[in-house]
Amino acid sequence: MLPHCFSNLTSLRDNENKMVLGPSFYTSTPKFQLEVISLSKCITSQQLSRKVPTFLYYQYDLRNVDLSHNNFSGTVPTWLLENNTKLGGLILKGNSFTGPLSFSSALISDVSSIDISENKLQGQIPTGICSTFPYLRRLFLSKNAFEGNIPLCLCGMKDLSFLDLSNNQLYGKVPEELITKGSLPILRLSNNNFSGNVVPMILSANGVRNLYLDGNNFSGEMTNVNVSTFEFPNSLWEIDLSNNKLHGKLPRWIGNASFLWRLDLSNNGFEGSIPMEFCKLNGLEFLDLSQNNLSGSIPSCFNPPYIEHVHIHGNRLRGPLSLAFYNSSSIVTLDLRGNNLTGSIPKWIYTLSSLSVLLLKDNHFHGKVPVELCKLHSLSIIDLSQNMFSGPIPSCLGNLSLPMQTKKILETGFYGTSIEEDETARSMTLNSVMDSYYPESYLEEVIEFTTKSGFFLYGGNILSYMTGIDLSCNNLTGHIPPELGNLSEIYSLNLSHNKLTGVIPSSFAKLHQIESLDLSYNNLSGEIPNQLVELNSLEVFSVAYNNLSGSIPEKAQFGTFIENSYEGNPFLCGTILHKSCSKIDSPSTISTVSEDKGEDGLIDTYDFCVSFLVSYVVLLLTIFVVLYINPYWRRAWFSLVGKCITTYRYSNVGNFLTYHIFKQCV
């Protein structure tokens, strides 16, 4: 609670320092006049009301107001704008304001930034917003429930430089004048119901720097442009058209976008090959063409000098990697999962010196896992699962440091200047209140990785810390290298569904950070090392379907694992398996007994085969004689045989499709 003695107070900032506002804070008339108030994330649930504190009714000199993320309810307090004629910035995002949005018809010329995003506002965006705030520079209305069309008056606001209407229920066509006005660097219309053709908007986007049209209903082809006469707008740095209904071939004219930094065309219906013109995108840092129907091979010339993140998963690309990405020392993420790529991992993979995330899952790569991977000191996530790799696991993989990599996060930067304070005027500048909130880019680097028996998406700071190796569902042979125990920073290790033999290395006890360890479906033998009880972070553990024997550890984390973690190992024993270790036969004893039984069974099998063959011949002769004598039975027999053949044929077709659609190893 604020003391009344603060009569000379002009600036109140208490961000994220939980304040408990007493009744007087809502009812009393303050003795101070503020110029800046910033109370983001600071009002606790112990207060008496969820309404905006009434002491603000008596403030008339406010320049900047930030009441974000406090769960205030009721209607939007537009009286803050009406009472404070010098107000420049208003941030009310992350609350629970409801109802339609309406503003006074009076001119308020000083307001340049308004953020009412992440609330529960409904209805249409008021057209009066343009006349009330003619010099508005930044408007954020995202994550509400606004519907209808974009007000045409926004097209005439010459000072508007940042417009975010994303995550609403807006529909119709995007006004072309909004794009062509030439002074709107950042336009975000993501996740609405806009429709129409996006090509004219891109062609005329002079002055637009970041264009986000993802998550809408834009449709049609993007190829109807004369490449020889077309000049790509030099201002466009970033385009996001993902999650729309675009189809046809990828536009060759994109190759003219020499200033383009980031391009996202994922989750559409593009088909055909990747145009050679994409090789001319020399400024490209981020490319996402995933989840389309692209085919053909990756152009060998595709090697942008500054490329950092490449996502082309979920297509039908084929062929070897050849020289694509060769010597791309800047590349951090290479995601080629879910294609039909063949061949081996090229020896030049070590030239990707900055590579941190390598995802080649679900392709047709073969050959050995190359030791050149061990030279990539920035590697922290490797997924080579569901391929046809063979041979031993390189022991040098244990030398990888798996470092934390902030480079895995897509750099966004911030719009405007950093927070500053004008101590002479004892107030924060407008940029200090508004600009520090909003990133320059809304594209986020997110990767999918299988761990803990499930698919997980990693992005942001979590991606920086995530480390893992997945070599499952291949044909790897030999022993598990004890050197893998040196991967002390690894969180997930999956070697399942291979043909590995030998014992589980006791050195795995040094995997102090590991949360998921899967060694199932191999030919491992011996006992589970008791030293593994030292793995205090282990959450998921499986050695199912091996040839392990002896008692299972039951201390620490191993007391939490269920029977499924050990199934398919008949010689394991322990409380979890409801099998006493004092009564179980050893593998060697049971093996000897089985061999003795096999010798006796050989004579029985011979006698059985002779008698079965004689009976079978007699049965066939009897059926032949009966069918020859009786024509009615003969027709019935042929009809039955025809039905059986038809059923067998369709049954085999169904099994074939099932086998190829649903892989055994997932």
Go through the PLM ranges and name each one.
Residues C581-V666:
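Terminal membrane/secretory targeting segments in land-plant proteins
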